[in-house]
């Protein structure tokens, strides 16, 4: 869920998770236009990942699951134990991929709290 994603961001990037809220055109709720840089592209890919597990004829998760569904992870891996559902593992995989992407790319302060109307 949201809190687990926030924890991952803080732990693996060393940044406050709120730094990513409103970053560029895609970080935070919704998104439009072209990503402004590599970090914003991480958010775009994260949105695409969530869409892939919540849409289509046989979705793995409900549309709201990514915001409340708990999952289990150790280190940088999603748990495959009996406590974690298929949906939870899918959400976890999307979140871990995003965090690894954030960590690989430069955070540019000029894109924090970016004006979405220019996207």
UniProtKB/Swiss-Prot annotation:
Binding site for Ca(2+): 28, 30, 47
Catalytic activity line of the entry: a 1,2-diacyl-sn-glycero-3-phosphocholine + H2O = a 1-acyl-sn-glycero-3-phosphocholine + a fatty acid + H(+)
Main location: secreted
Miscellaneous information on this protein: Lacks hemolytic activity.
Swiss-Prot/TrEMBL cofactor(s): Ca(2+)
Described function: Sea anemone phospholipase A2 (PLA2). When incubated with plasma, this protein shows a moderate anticoagulant activity (0.15 ug of enzyme/200 uL of plasma), inhibiting clotting induced by thrombin. This enzyme also induces myotoxicity, and edema. PLA2 catalyzes the calcium-dependent hydrolysis of the 2-acyl groups in 3-sn-phosphoglycerides.
Compartments where located: Secreted; Nematocyst
UniProt xrefs under InterPro entries: PLipase_A2, PLipase_A2_Asp_AS, PLipase_A2_dom, PLipase_A2_dom_sf, PLipase_A2_His_AS
Assembly and interaction partners: Homodimer.
EC number(s) on file: 3.1.1.4
Keyword set, alphabetical order: Blood coagulation cascade inhibiting toxin, Disulfide bond, Hemostasis impairing toxin, Hydrolase, Inflammatory response, Metal-binding, Myotoxin, Nematocyst, Secreted, Toxin
Superkingdom field: Eukaryota
Protein name listed in UniProt: Phospholipase A2 A2-actitoxin-Cgg2a
Positions of disulphide bridges: 25-119, 27-43, 42-101, 49-94, 61-87, 78-92
Active site location: 46, 95
GO CC annotation terms, alphabetical: extracellular region; nematocyst
Family: Belongs to the phospholipase A2 family.
Cofactor stoichiometry and binding remark: Binds 1 Ca(2+) ion per subunit.
GO MF entries: calcium ion binding; calcium-dependent phospholipase A2 activity; phospholipid binding; toxin activity
UniProt GO BP: arachidonate secretion; lipid catabolic process; phospholipid metabolic process; venom-mediated edema in another organism; venom-mediated myocyte killing in another organism; venom-mediated suppression of blood coagulation
Lyase listed as a keyword: no
A Pfam family: Phospholip_A2_1
């Amino acid at each position: 869920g949201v809190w687990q994603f926030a924890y991952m961001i803080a732990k693996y990037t060393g940044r406050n998770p709120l730094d990513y809220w409103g970053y560029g055109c895609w970080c935070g709720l919704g998104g439009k236009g072209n990503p402004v840089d590599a970090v914003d592209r991480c958010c775009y890919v994260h949105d695409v990942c969530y869409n892939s597990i919540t849409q289509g004829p046989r979705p793995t998760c409900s549309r709201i699951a990514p915001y409340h569904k708990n999952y289990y992870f150790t280190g940088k891996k999603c748990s495959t134990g009996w406590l974690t559902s298929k949906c939870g593992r899918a959400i976890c995989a999307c979140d871990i991929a995003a965090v690894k992407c954030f960590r690989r790319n430069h955070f540019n302060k000029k894109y924090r709290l970016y004006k979405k109307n220019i996207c």
